[in-house]
């Protein structure tokens, strides 16, 4: 009924479902490391190495934002013990600490995982994303989103190159 409440609820849904999808994809990669042919196992290991710091930091940050929105949706009542969202917020805030600080995860990703094996993991991830955007670009209603994702991938590549331009990504 209220547009702003609807926006906050949809954002929470997107954060939670996106985090779950990322975790399930990583779980699938764990399984694929031990099944299939040797090339598929190697690809799964490379992708998992690149995605692990992201899988640790992204959900902890954005699901905390989702919890903050839940408190807002409750009009502040969620910050009291009337609703469990205040406990969820505290628990979620600890996830950012338990999974390692975002700075540590960023250094791991940019300092080690991106350059590992000559950048093979990031190149494989980029090729998978590109293949997905190519397929999605031909599906009615998805082209705009596919183009946005392709542009974001280009920006990621440029940002990664810029970070490494000095030789030390800090």
Q: What feature does the model see in each segment?
A:
Residues 1-170:
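Flavin-dependent oxidoreductase catalytic core characteristic
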């Amino acid at each position: 009924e209220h547009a702003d409440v609807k926006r906050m609820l949809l954002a929470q849904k997107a954060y939670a479902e996106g985090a779950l999808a990322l975790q399930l994809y990583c779980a699938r990669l764990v399984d694929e490391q031990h099944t299939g042919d040797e090339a598929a196992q190697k690809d799964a290991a490379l992708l998992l190495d690149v995605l692990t710091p992201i899988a640790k930091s992204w959900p902890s940050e954005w699901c905390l934002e989702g919890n903050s929105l839940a408190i807002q949706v409750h009009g502040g009542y969620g910050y009291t013990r009337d609703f469990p969202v205040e406990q969820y917020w505290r628990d979620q805030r600890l996830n950012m600490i338990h999974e390692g600080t975002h700075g540590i995860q960023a250094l791991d990703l940019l300092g080690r995982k991106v350059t590992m094996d000559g950048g093979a993991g990031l190149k494989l991830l980029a090729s998978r994303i590109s293949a997905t955007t190519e397929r999605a670009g031909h599906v009615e209603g998805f082209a705009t989103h596919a183009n946005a994702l392709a542009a974001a991938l280009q920006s990621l590549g440029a940002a990664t190159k810029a970070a490494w331009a000095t030789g030390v990504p800090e």
